Design a protein with these regions (language model features):
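ATP-dependent adenylation/nucleotidyltransferase module used to activate substrates
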Residues: 1-155, 182, 257, 364
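AMP-forming adenylation/ATP pyrophosphatase catalytic core
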Residues: 128-134, 140-366
Length: 366
């Protein structure tokens, strides 16, 4: 009796090659497509670039992949659950002036919880996804492709959820995955990577968010001088470190968002990428998920996806909180994830609650 593996088939090349590799290894492979977003049900009218529902296009591609591989494809809808567990969190955080990462919560509540339960109903011994990550024993390791490593997004997935999980492409680079897809004539071999919000797709961000949150105009303040230099159109449209599309088209100097105050609806900017107002040296991290029993004092941290690792000193607090100290971290942003590594191993991850400089709360980050 072959071991049955249910693969999350998204309609993209990574999940397609994952299914291919598992089939080559002799597993009984079954595809399962999740539809987690419905533009009609969710009143999603603004921001769709081509007028075509991307979720149905993805399902078409998923079906073509499974037909090519001669494996069955099932479909499940988690539209309500995604809205309640992931998207409402996303909107709530935006309203607080923070910068959330919905992909992290999607993994926690949908891909490695509801999906796994649905796979078990299909008789799965294991599940697999197209994440660039590796599991060795009970350790979560970075994917071999440093540019594509997705352990950052897996940082809120529990050790229990990671049991019976396979990451078939974690040992490959993206070019190697593309090469395999072309070699075996997979219909999505040349499909471009998705870069939008998890399961929603690529959108004009501000237009998309305007479906659900109405931005309130407010002042843009030069943090150095305290002078008003412009007007913003809703704090949810900006993130710390942002340079483009701030709304100061007549200003020839390079300006960066360095702070947001949701109480006064104020956006703060600083000039120059090396501005001291973009720097911090300490952060309080909440809702920490411990993926390992290792609790080192010295490690490295990633404060946003694809950012460079930063050496940190860690203090372990009560209530699943940690305090991390570092040297001149740039654009460390409340609401984003802080993920801790020891070499290749992902140890833990939590949400940045508060940021400090020289032992003081940063006043323009409220």
């Amino acid at each position: 009796m072959f071991m049955k593996v249910v693969v999350g088939i998204s309609g993209g090349v990574d999940s397609a090659v994952s299914a291919l590799l598992l089939k080559q290894e002799g597993y009984d492979v079954v595809g399962l497509f999740m539809k987690n977003w419905d533009s009609n049900i969710n009143n999603d009218k603004e921001g769709i670039t081509d007028g075509v529902c991307p979720q149905e296009l993805d399902y078409r591609d998923a079906k073509a992949v499974c037909d090519e591989l001669c494996i069955p494809l099932y479909r499940v809808d988690f539209i309500k659950e995604y809205w309640n567990d992931v998207f409402k969190y996303f909107l709530d955080e935006l309203e607080k002036g923070r910068t959330p990462n919905p992909d992290i919560m999607c993994n926690k509540y949908i891909k490695f919880d509801l999906f796994k339960k649905e796979a078990k109903k299909l008789g799965a011994d294991k599940i697999a996804t197209g994440h660039y990550a590796r599991i060795k024993g009970n350790r979560l390791l970075r994917g071999v492709d440093n540019n594509k490593d997705q352990t950052y997004f897996l940082s809120q997935v529990s050790t229990e959820q990671l049991k019976d999980v396979l990451f078939p492409i974690g040992h490959l680079t993206k070019p190697e995955v593309r090469k395999l897809a072309k070699e075996y004539n997979l219909p999505v071999a040349d499909k471009k990577d998705s870069t939008g919000i998890c399961f929603i797709g690529e959108r004009h961000y501000q237009q998309f968010v305007s479906n659900y949150l109405k931005g309130k105009d407010g002042d843009i303040i030069d943090v150095e001088t305290g002078k008003k230099v412009g007007t913003h159109h809703g704090l949810m449209n900006y993130t710390i470190g942002q340079r483009r599309n701030v709304g100061l088209s007549g200003d020839q100097k390079r300006h960066y968002v360095c702070g947001k105050d949701s109480k006064t609806n104020t956006l703060y900017i600083a000039y120059g990428s090396d501005s001291k107002y973009l720097l911090s040296d300490e952060a309080l991290i909440e809702n920490v998920n411990f993926i390992s029993d290792k609790h080192p004092t010295f490690a490295t941290a990633k404060f946003r996806y694809r950012s460079e690792d930063v050496p940190v000193t860690i203090e372990y607090l009560e209530n699943n909180q940690i305090r991390v100290k570092y040297v001149d971290g740039k654009a460390v942003t409340p609401g984003q994830a802080c993920v801790i590594y020891l070499g290749e191993q992902c140890l833990m991850g939590g949400i940045i609650k508060q940021v400090f400089k020289d032992g003081k709360d940063i006043w323009y980050l409220k």
